[in-house]
Amino acid sequence: MNKLISFFILVTFSYSSCETTKNIFGNKAKETTVEELNTKVLEKTIIYKTFSGKANIDITGPNISQSVNAQIDILKDSVIGISLRVLGIEGARVMITPDSIKILDRLNQQYIPRSFSFIETNFSLPITFSDLENLICGNPVFYNNTTLSQGISDDKYVLFAQKDVYKNTIWLSADLDILRMFIEDLMNKRTLTLTYDEFDKIEGRQFAFLRTILIDATDDFTANIAFSKITFNQPFEFTFNVNPKYERID
């Protein structure tokens, strides 16, 4: 369960709904400048105060083949709360803040507090709390508005951007919805591929409901995640109470 939790924290954030309809992109990409495309990408950024959603997640990798259900709640810039269930029973609860990650492993009756640097230490990935929020909402990650170049391929816009040692190739539909991101770690020779499908509008926001995550590194992982019952800007309740009988793992 601990290995599953660690992997889930890293790649948990993609969506699908059993009630959505697939968006067929009818428009064609038109010639534009890098500056115009950057501006349009920023205009498509999802703005919110709270997010809530349920997910069905299938994860495969070395020594992992697991399906879980998850409830994910976000209070923007403050906390990400995650409840993981297997066969209807909560196996773990995770609370992430900008400076900490706290895990309740109910199956092993353990409390595992960590600093936010746990992610970088274990995965050599300098991801921020804001990056995690962007992953959940489908906003660009490892993208600091510094686009090296852009082009058009098969009626899709292609952006080439770089942030530190991370090179990000982003494919956009003619409607400027993110279809795929291919992130290369130029120093450690690792890649992260995010694909997006099943677009629909949720409360006026164009949203990719089906995503696949591929990590190509020392260990290779795949995650297929199906999200449903998504809401924005609605109150939610997320509790994180540590049972005094749980073993603390420092």
Q: Predicted segments — roles?
A:
Residues M1-C18:
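Sec-dependent bacterial lipoprotein signal peptides
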Residues D58-T60, L87-I89, K201:
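Hydrophobic lipid-interacting interfaces of membrane-associated proteins
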Residues T20, S149-D250:
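Gly/Pro-enriched, hydrophobic low-complexity segments
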Residues N122-G151:
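C-terminal low-complexity, charged extensions that often adopt amphipathic alpha-helices
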Residues I80-S130:
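An acidic-aromatic
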Residues Q71-I72, G91-R93, T169-W171, E198:
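Short, surface-exposed charged micro-motifs
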Residues C18-Q66, R248-D250:
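N-terminal leader/targeting segments and the immediate start of mature chains
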Residues K49-I57, Q66-I74, S78-L84, A92-V94, ...:
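One face of beta-strands
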